[in-house]
């Protein structure tokens, strides 16, 4: 009886595991395979940034789940991103290729009435602790980026499928951008060379920007050209957009723009 229970229990665990693996494959598009040589299950593309972010979130969730109420020993950022409640319905609409209607306002005109926008959502983007959706604006007949924190209501238009073809290579739309600011019509990616001075001291509260940027690159195109005793020189290929300029300004005198000249001139003017 015990051996039969063990066999049945083992079969149940195996079926549960296979079902979970199937759900992960279908929902998150992550492939998990069994390594026969070690008899262990492995994620086949664990170097992918998307997979790494999911695993990081799972690590945090598992730690919190294992230890119960930790409010006395763990403190979270109080400035929580708004609009995350729309992630799930937008993701569902993306998967099912369905239109949704947004009730949307602009930050600089928040007192005015919300605008209604019917969109065909293609991609969700996180940047600087905010979420955005890249979508086809049906009324404007153009690609637009909408901040989820500016959505007041979302109506799920379940019966209406996409009427516009999904643009080719839409997943690469933000590749040349620092965050979610794209400005395709006027801005092209440029080569930017930056020198970050090394601080004489390095603390938890004031990290050395040169070392910090090795661990947390400014952009996926970042390359280290050279590292000297007093500075590190980085090269990027990126669109020079207002959010990128704001990021550079946050480093103050610790960053020097080597190229292009017009970026150096713009930063100098803003620092006065």
For each predicted feature, which ranges?
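General beta-strand recognition
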Residues: 42, 101, 132-134, 233, ...
